[in-house]
Design a protein with these regions (language model features):
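Acceptor/aglycone-binding surface of glycosyltransferases and processive sugar-polymer synthases
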Residues: 1-3, 8-10, 22-104, 131-137
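Acidic metal-phosphate-binding loop of nucleotide-sugar-dependent transferases
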Residues: 18-19
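DNA-recognition element of transcription regulators
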Residues: 108
């Protein structure tokens, strides 16, 4: 909401524990500026690019994304990714007050709602590195 209220044309979301590399923001922005409405920093668009996750967590994440893709028809490989760049119009159109879920379901709902509204979604491959310090909320 802050990005919308302050007039930004592109709004990015990422983990702030450096699981997402800030250097990749440029690639997400470029893909959005080239005509994509939502750009996902994807762990799974080119194989599996996850470092230091237990195998059980990796398998659960990977197959959950496959399941969601089958059920929803979302044309992306990493449906639960939290590293994204939105064009302003997407967030204004989907109505953030109508988003109901939290956590991973929030990530899916945002992408699915944008997709159902006809927005173009693209993936950019990233390497996700599990945090070494801190905890998830």
């Amino acid at each position: 909401r802050w990005g919308l209220e302050n007039g930004f044309d592109y709004i990015c979301e990422m983990d702030c524990d450096f699981s997402h590399n800030p250097d990749d923001l440029v690639r997400l922005y470029r893909a959005a500026a080239e005509g994509n409405d939502v750009v996902v920093g994807s762990r799974y668009v080119q194989g599996v690019n996850v470092v230091n996750w237990p195998m059980s967590r990796l398998l659960m994440s990977y197959f959950a994304s496959k399941y969601v893709r089958i059920i929803t028809g979302l044309p992306i490989h990493d449906t639960t990714a939290g590293f994204k760049c939105y064009r302003r119009e997407v967030l204004e159109t989907i109505g953030l007050d109508g988003i109901r879920f939290k956590g991973y379901a929030f990530q899916i709902e945002m992408k699915f709602t944008a997709y159902k509204c006809g927005f173009k979604i693209a993936e950019v491959p990233v390497i996700f590195v599990n945090r070494e310090l801190g905890t998830s909320k």
